[in-house]
């Protein structure tokens, strides 16, 4: 018997994945130019165009996700989106690998405009899933993420880029950490 069957897991409902630094492999024109522009200012008015161009690098990842989970509810699984688990937890999938080169660990990028469009439903627990740790994100992006986390009462930020178990608090404001 397969482990998923023994645990009574449904791959369509119980599997949550986010893109990592090895997933953005589809060729994108001017990739380095877009990454440089975003590194200069990831929250600039022109940033959405660069993020959109870089999201094209995740076409193979998106195909993989849709092959594995045919009725995946999001058209573009590599974009920031929310999936609700069994009407109990909102998992916020964030693509923090959008500007990853596999070498540099700091000042990682994420399209915070996409995050701002996400509105978790109901009184469910909200958990962010990301590849890169919060501390590895660009400071300007961290600030925008903190605003969103504060508004939507995020309970946890789970990541796995560094392949180690670690617990770190994220100070949302002077009165609250997650």
How should each PLM-predicted stretch be described?
Residues 1, 19-20, 130, 160:
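Active-site flanking residues adjacent to catalytic metal/cofactor-binding acidic residues
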Residues 2-106, 148, 173:
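Extended active-site neighborhood of metal-dependent phosphoesterases/phosphodiesterases
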Residues 80-173:
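His/acidic metal-ligating clusters that form di-metal
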Residues 175-178:
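Metal-dependent phosphoesterase/phosphodiesterase active-site architecture
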């Amino acid at each position: 018997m397969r482990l998923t069957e023994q645990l009574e897991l449904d791959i369509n409902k119980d599997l949550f994945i986010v893109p990592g630094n090895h997933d953005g492999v589809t060729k994108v024109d001017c990739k380095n130019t877009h990454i440089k522009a975003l590194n200069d200012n990831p929250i600039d008015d022109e940033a959405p165009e660069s993020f959109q161009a870089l999201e094209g690098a995740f076409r193979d990842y998106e195909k993989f996700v849709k092959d594995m989970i045919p009725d995946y509810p999001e058209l573009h699984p590599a974009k920031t989106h929310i999936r609700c688990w069994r009407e109990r937890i909102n998992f916020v999938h964030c693509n923090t690998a959008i500007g990853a080169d596999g070498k540099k660990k700091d000042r990682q990028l994420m399209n915070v405009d996409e995050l701002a469009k996400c509105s978790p439903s109901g009184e469910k627990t909200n958990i962010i899933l990301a590849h890169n740790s919060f501390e590895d994100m660009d400071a300007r992006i961290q600030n925008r993420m903190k605003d969103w986390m504060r508004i939507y009462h995020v309970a946890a930020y789970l990541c796995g880029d560094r392949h180690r178990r670690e617990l770190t608090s994220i100070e949302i404001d002077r009165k609250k950490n997650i």
